[in-house]
Amino acid sequence: MKAAEIREKFLKFFESKGHTIVRSSSLVPGNDPTLMFTNSGMVQFKDVFLGTDPRPYSRATTAQRSVRAGGKHNDLENVGYTARHHTFFEMLGNFSFGDYFKHDAIKFAWELLTTVYQLPKDKLWVTVYQEDDEAYDIWAKEVGVPTERIIRIGDNKGARYASDNFWTMGDTGPCGPCTEIFYDHGPDVWGGPPGSPEEDGDRYIEIWNLVFMQFNRDAQGNMTRLPKQSVDTGMGLERLAAVLQHVHSNYEIDLFQNLIKAAARVTEISDLTNNSLKVIADHIRACSFLIVDGVIPGNEGRGYVLRRIVRRAIRHGYKLGRKGAFFHKLVADLVAEMGTAYPELKEAEQRVTDVLRQEEERFFETIEHGMSILEAALADVEAKGGKVLDGELAFKLHDTYGFPLDLTADVCRERGMTVDEPAFDDAMARQREQARAAGKFKATQGLEYSGAKTTFHGYEEIAFDDAKVVALYVDGSAVNEVKAGQDAVVVLDHTPFYAESGGQVGDQGVLANAATRFAVADTLKVQADVIGHHGTLEQGTLKVGDVLRAEIDAQRRARTQRNHSATHLMHKALREVLGAHVQQKGSLVDADKTRFDFAHNAPMTDDEIRRVEQIVNDEILANAPGIVRVMPYDEAVKGGAMALFGEKYGDEVRVLDLGFSRELCGGTHVHRTGDIGLFKIVVEGGVAAGIRRVEAITGDNAVRYVQELDARVNEAAAALKAQPSELTQRIAQVQEQVKSLEKELGALKSKLASSQGDELAQQAVEIGGVYVLAATLDGADAKTLRETVDKLKDKLKSAAIVLAAVEGGKVSLIAGVTPDASKKVKAGELVNFVAQQVGGKGGGRPDMAQAGGTEPANLPGALAGVKGWVEERL
């Protein structure tokens, strides 16, 4: 039975038992910031179990894509070396939310395994929690499992309820016993049943875990029964497939065998048992699905984990002899295996391929040099009888050549060595400290404040008349008074000033009364609800308790608002034009422009840029109102509001409807889209692999930009004696004229070189049957020098030639050697002999090489030495 059929039978079985088939959630958890990746089937149902996310069903079943390669759950280092470790796996599960409990859960599992999958009953063993008599009796008395194959497992992890058969969500909260089902591979495989000293062997393999959420544990450790008891089960598809396909390693199942064969094809390896092929086959699954879910290779967080996995796969390909990009070629094979079950993979095939190819090409630029350094260091350690690689060197490989620590550790392990990880960590810490010392940080963090929060009025007002000073800070310390000329941070009880957040810069403006004037240069958060006004006291003395008029720079705010609102419209337009994979990765909105970074793996075409501009300007012309609502986060997301990747949101969120855009946003915005005026993209480029950046301007800035562009067009048209409407045609005519003249000039240069070549041939000196010539060719470019050398070689038959030209204070050199002489006189060595004397270097083939230099004054002497240099080698 193939893996695809196993998956389908599982889902269909539970659907027949009244379960709703729920599609796999993203590998990036949307409801649990503590998790790096979705690592089990229950993650998407966590809030359902907690009662905060009501669903229209009480029974569910899933095939959940899962990754264990970061944070607490990290299987990366074992992948490829064991039979059952993977970075990516599929977790089959069925769930009951206050519906059925132990009886049905156990009976469903037994029926599926023994009737649908037809596993022999005498091959199945089960474990239960020591005190779970109910589960024990169901297995023994109702299902009929012999008691010798039912094993009670107690608190075997050193604490009360710390057991392989007791599940907890955390230190407090829902928890309960679990029962696990094991498959016995038979006496030919070493190992003992669970709970025995030999349980780590491969004979008895856990295939299904049924968790019974029965209790709630409080902070004192007290257990109370949950009013609604639930079930969470998980069974690894790959493990089950190995059992049903009668193999002992997950890598022997059909799905993996097809990927391993594909990996062998692209790496040109015939030995299908090579562990590196297993690594590559595993990693293409994790990498592809992470990219499908919006993760891009990067230097931190999820992006760095993805980069580590990609580079580990590349390193194993390199180990097999691949010196160029190969990994991305496996995406099509993965789509063939899993694209039907997961159509999102098929839809994103080209994007996944492009992202992986770019990451490969980037790493292949450094891997060879890095590997040579690592291999030399390991050889040195071995020669000295050591077993530990210096952590400082491992850090250099990480910092300079992009080698993740686990990649270096992987190579070391293959040689029976380890890495000095504490030394690596020390080096990393030093670098971070240096970076902190070198950077300039705004003085908002670390200010000690324990007063009331600031009330923000900036959504409605640009000024507030009776703002009271509640705290003052100078150089990071709280003070009671600030004097004229001092820089300070002012905290008010009420303010219209927006504090930098969500990509929007903080407001500027003035705090003043009859005797005092404080110029606000920036506004930043001291705490989540406390706003700090950063600036300089220009007049008077400012004390805690003073009352001021707080007024923002209204013109600057208006420009910033236009840019911020345009960013929302642009984000939506980018998704319409480029695809739903577009995700915001960063932004900066100020009075001058909006800068927007987003996930996309190719430069935008001119047509795509024009389409985005058109869509945004159409929304501006529609003059739609901006509608703001405050609502619970879950309600907002269900209503279609876009939650931005990496942003933190509270229980209550601010939702902005602006034209066709709906986003969660706490920033300030225009009242109607027409207030934006005009939208123009001025910059599009790449900032990292898979990340593009767009800069755009609005309003009067956009009008001014278009006017300046129009003026330049008119100037160019006048210079070419054409009307602006004819400019493109006139430029094409001029380009044709230039091309024709360049061709004519090239012909004249060749003709001149030919005539000079005849003269130069007469200057050649014969040494040992080889004609040697070193001369300057006035007015020649590199192409002319090469052509002249070729003609001289043909004319002289046996020769070693160096020709030079000087232009703009720079020397161009070409050396040519005929085949009969190139065994003793190499053109690359000859040209370098001259180049080093004129402040340069070069290289090339034994018969033709070129170089440059910056010291033309030394050229005559350098050319004069050629005859002697050649004579020594003949």
Swiss-Prot record:
Main location group: cytoplasm
Residue sites binding Zn(2+) per the record: H564, H568, C665, H669
Gene3D superfamilies assigned: 2.40.30.130, 3.10.310.40, 3.30.54.20, 6.10.250.550, Bira Bifunctional Protein, Domain 2, Threonyl-trna Synthetase, Chain A, domain 2
GO molecular function, one term: zinc ion binding
Annotated SUPFAM superfamilies: Class II aaRS and biotin synthetases, Putative anticodon-binding domain of alanyl-tRNA synthetase (AlaRS), ThrRS/AlaRS common domain, Translation proteins
Subcellular location as annotated: Cytoplasm
GO cellular component: cytosol
UniProt remark on cofactor binding: Binds 1 zinc ion per subunit.
CDD domains hit by this protein: AlaRS_core
Keyword Cell inner membrane found: no
EC code(s) of this entry: 6.1.1.7
Any GO BP annotation: negative regulation of DNA-templated transcription
Enzyme class per UniProt: ligase
Keywords: Aminoacyl-tRNA synthetase, ATP-binding, Cytoplasm, Ligase, Metal-binding, Nucleotide-binding, Protein biosynthesis, RNA-binding, tRNA-binding, Zinc
Cofactor: Zn(2+)
Catalytic activity, as annotated: tRNA(Ala) + L-alanine + ATP = L-alanyl-tRNA(Ala) + AMP + diphosphate
Biological role stated in the UniProt entry: Catalyzes the attachment of alanine to tRNA(Ala) in a two-step reaction: alanine is first activated by ATP to form Ala-AMP and then transferred to the acceptor end of tRNA(Ala). Also edits incorrectly charged Ser-tRNA(Ala) and Gly-tRNA(Ala) via its editing domain.
This protein's domain notes: Consists of three domains; the N-terminal catalytic domain, the editing domain and the C-terminal C-Ala domain. The editing domain removes incorrectly charged amino acids, while the C-Ala domain, along with tRNA(Ala), serves as a bridge to cooperatively bring together the editing and aminoacylation centers thus stimulating deacylation of misacylated tRNAs.
Family, similarity comment: Belongs to the class-II aminoacyl-tRNA synthetase family.
Name of the molecule in the record: Alanine--tRNA ligase
Organism: Burkholderia orbicola (strain MC0-3)
Taxonomic lineage: Bacteria, Pseudomonadati, Pseudomonadota, Betaproteobacteria, Burkholderiales
